[in-house]
A protein has these predicted regions:
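A solvent-exposed, acidic/Ser-Thr-rich amphipathic alpha-helical stretch
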Residues: 9, 30-89
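Short, low-complexity N-terminal intrinsically disordered segments enriched in polar/charged residues
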Residues: 1-35, 144-150
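Short non-domain terminal segments
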Residues: 13-14, 31, 40-42, 110, ...
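Residue-level detector of alpha-helix boundaries and kinks
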Residues: 4, 17, 46-49, 101
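Short, mixed-charge, low-aromatic patches
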Residues: 15-25, 49-54, 69-73, 94-96
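A beta-strand edge to alpha-helix "cap/lid" segment located at domain peripheries
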Residues: 2-7, 67-150
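Short, solvent-exposed loop/turn segments that connect beta-strands within catalytic domains
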Residues: 24-26, 48-49, 89, 103-105
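Charged/polar, solvent-exposed surface patches and flexible loops
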Residues: 14-17, 34, 63, 67, ...
């Protein structure tokens, strides 16, 4: 059973699940946030306005994702590809997420590559590459009210 403290993050469940699937056997924790080290560094390499380039610490990551479900709700994640690095601490995962924009009901699809460093079975560094144009386009439609899906 998922810890009730993570209930506000259910909009991200498909992301959490595919991330844990990609890192299975390498990290400990029942929930994605439990796999994150307290002093983790998150880097977002392709960003859009309002999104940070870097976060320091697990609590900062949790705070960033706290309002995610107000804008986007994911209903699936797939296309997982796992790459091993020459550095045994590093895993590269590719995946796609699918969802909808809350304000408009428009579809949201994005692709990611995440370079993840693990130490002592916790994620200590996460470098994220995403299709920021897809995110910007979807969210700008939401802010202008364009493309209401049926």
């Amino acid at each position: 059973m998922t810890d009730p403290k993570y209930a506000p993050f259910t909009a991200l469940d498909p992301f959490f699940e595919i991330s844990q699937q990609g890192l299975a056997g390498l990290v400990d924790g029942d929930h994605y946030f439990d796999t994150i080290a307290d002093d983790v560094v998150f880097e977002f390499r392709y960003i859009f306005p309002g999104w940070p380039q870097r976060l320091n610490g697990r609590e900062a990551l949790i705070a960033l994702y706290a309002g995610y479900g107000n804008s986007i709700v994911l209903h699936g994640a797939d296309a997982l590809v796992i790459h091993r690095s020459q550095d045994p601490r590093v895993v590269i995962i590719e995946y796609e997420v699918h969802g909808k924009i809350v304000a408009t009901g428009a579809s949201y699809d994005n692709r990611f590559i995440s370079v993840v460093t693990i130490e002592d079975r916790k994620i200590v560094h996460w470098r994220d590459y995403m299709d920021s144009l897809a995110a910007m386009t979807a969210l700008s439609r939401a802010s202008t009210g364009a493309e209401k899906s049926e």
